[in-house]
Amino acid sequence: MLEINNIYNMDCLEGLKLLSDNSIDLVVTSPPYNMRTRIRNGEYTTREKSEHFSKKYEHFSDDLTIEEYYDFHKNVLTELLRVSKCVLWNYQIVTGSKSAVFKLIGDFADQI
């Protein structure tokens, strides 16, 4: 079990599994966007040209297949909805992730 009022530097899924149901009042998160391609200045840009957008994720490839990306978010959302009374999930639908995000919205429609 995690102690309250402490900061833990750990994988979010590992940490979430250590929390009790409904033990968090509010979660605000901005998950990785899986930016394989991105529209920049009205044009599609390859990941190589927009590398500085993805560099902040040192331990996350940000270049997952749609299936891997969906599974990652499904696991995180399942745990967030279990431990939190309210979840604010800031998400931008970018080119490389649209189908996974829309599937997640459909799969979690009754819970969100």
Language model feature labels by segment:
Residues L2-I112:
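Core catalytic lobe of class I
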